[in-house]
């Protein structure tokens, strides 16, 4: 499988991790569409772009039109300042598209790749010593880009300027990407693709399942999206917009959603052909 890694050259976390990955893989400098720096290692293209990561809407064509999926390396920002290594899919479950993408549009998820990245981040953080101070977690689906037709998964380092410029953080992301690419084929063969509903932004129950169960989780639609008017169509797309096929299970955090909200998920899941499992 051909994969691509993209980052913003204006983002110290993404740029640092992307260049660390190129060094780790002994990637050769090359040129690729739209990028200001580009490296090639076998079937993997690693490229930096002069735009924000949340606005990389050109990923179908760049950096590798033949890539099946794209991993975006990026900084993570949180007002709490919590040190974290996160994985999530892009998409705007509600009308709010202030951070790129189209309103009420989800990108294509890749549950197996997200699982491979999260497991690999946990492993890499232990190897680099960051596990003691950094939390490895999924995030709910949020921000752009939303228009690429190929799947996009974000792997992020946060949450302060100090963290974004931490070389150990860059190394951790780079090691995780290398490991995820190696383990992806087996994970994809064995895992059950799912979508998540409910929970907070950091979806702790879904994170635990991603790390420890046979499920691989793509889009996660948090409780606050329901409170802000998520539509039935978006809920259905959280299941359907998944590579290589729709999610087979909707994992619903029961206590975090009100009864009408749970019914919305049940109806959307039935229409999309997914089984509902409460967690």
Swiss-Prot record:
Reaction equation(s) it catalyzes: a D-aminoacyl-tRNA + H2O = a tRNA + a D-alpha-amino acid + H(+); glycyl-tRNA(Ala) + H2O = tRNA(Ala) + glycine + H(+)
Coiled-coil regions listed: none
Residue intervals passing through the bilayer: none
Enzyme Commission designation: 3.1.1.96
Region feature (Disordered): 81-100
Required cofactor names: Zn(2+)
Record text on subunit structure and interactions: Monomer.
Identification of the protein by name: D-aminoacyl-tRNA deacylase
The species this protein was found in: Aeropyrum pernix (strain ATCC 700893 / DSM 11879 / JCM 9820 / NBRC 100138 / K1)
Record lineage: Archaea, Thermoproteota, Thermoprotei, Desulfurococcales, Desulfurococcaceae
Underlying gene: dtdA
